[in-house]
From Swiss-Prot:
<dbReference type="InterPro" id="IPR006527">
    <property type="entry name" value="F-box-assoc_dom_typ1"/>
</dbReference>
<dbReference type="InterPro" id="IPR017451">
    <property type="entry name" value="F-box-assoc_interact_dom"/>
</dbReference>
<dbReference type="Pfam" id="PF07734">
    <property type="entry name" value="FBA_1"/>
</dbReference>
<dbReference type="InterPro" id="IPR050796">
    <property type="entry name" value="SCF_F-box_component"/>
</dbReference>
<dbReference type="InterPro" id="IPR001810">
    <property type="entry name" value="F-box_dom"/>
</dbReference>
<protein>
    <recommendedName>
        <fullName>F-box protein At1g11810</fullName>
    </recommendedName>
</protein>
<feature type="domain" description="F-box">
    <location>
        <begin position="2"/>
        <end position="48"/>
    </location>
</feature>
<dbReference type="Pfam" id="PF00646">
    <property type="entry name" value="F-box"/>
</dbReference>
<dbReference type="InterPro" id="IPR036047">
    <property type="entry name" value="F-box-like_dom_sf"/>
</dbReference>
Amino acid sequence: MTTTMSTLPVVLVDEILARVPITSLRSLRSTCKKWEASSKTNLVGGKATARKSSHVGFILIGDKICSMKLDLNGGDDFVDTSVNQVSAFDGFAISQLFHCDGLLFCISNNHYSNYTLMVCNMYLGETRLIQNRSLFESYQNFCSYAFGYDSSKNRNHKILRNNSVSGGYEIYSLKSDSWKDLNVDLEKSIHLWRLGSVSLKGNAYFRVIKVIEEGVWEYNLLCFDFTRESFGKLLSLPFESLGDEGEGIMVISCVRDDHLAVLYQRDTLGIWISTEIEPNKVSWREFLQVDLATLDGFPDVFIAGRFIVDEEKQVVVVFGQETELDLNHGNAFIFGRDGYFTSFTVGDAPPEDFTSYVPSLVSLQIDKTGKRKARDD
């Protein structure tokens, strides 16, 4: 009896699918109906992401997007990485990455194009180029962005950005394919951090700085609710950040789209994970504290950037930011309990950005009535 792809055991198909790069999924889906159905169950339904020590995402090296798979195996061979440049983004120089609900939102640093924003579903092979309101506004990559969705049945995905022309905020709806101004504002003492917002359960969370007095400020967290299209209250952080400008590094990340994590680097490097989080309320638990000065062989100059929390292995993966005295090249560091740390290389230079990624069936197509097609899940 001849074995064909359609007659392979389900267990073997699932194992094959778990090893397929994100960017190859579209070609694989056309192999046979069984494989397409299995890919939806395996990748979208959660079998692949249920492997808690396997982390899939996209990393920005220079202005090029690369897919990355990171397996934390334990033992001597603790880290297994796979980094591959994504050819689909050739010619679209990227400056920022965002992920929400299986969609990847990219911002180009091509200031002379009227299309500097792109949303794509790598699993479905769909892409949406978003037109700016005017050519001048293509400079919006210097502004703060956020990506999320409202609580409607079919999840209308939206993009928030501050408007450098008017000084206010505007929002783009993927469903209507249009921009509109928002009647929202923040206190003059509150400033959104331009980079690094994350999406969690449809809402966006920003790092913000609140100015206490001249030269003195503190970090806070701020949620933008895409259903209400408004900001929430300032959310407290689990550490004391009051100080002079330039003191302390704060970064936020998501833990499997279930919780928010915050990193704070000052004399030590600390990680906390939310136990409860809503637009106007948050509580925290400590995950890890690392005294960098006690780590033998750790570089003298290190500024923490994006990070990944692995609760099963009780470790955190931290990508460094590039500095004038950068000696880390493209290294990332893994920190664990009892002073454990190791490093691995992800490229020739420190990554500019990173976002985790979970495939989904969210379509970017618009039907003849001008509405987005319903979710197929």
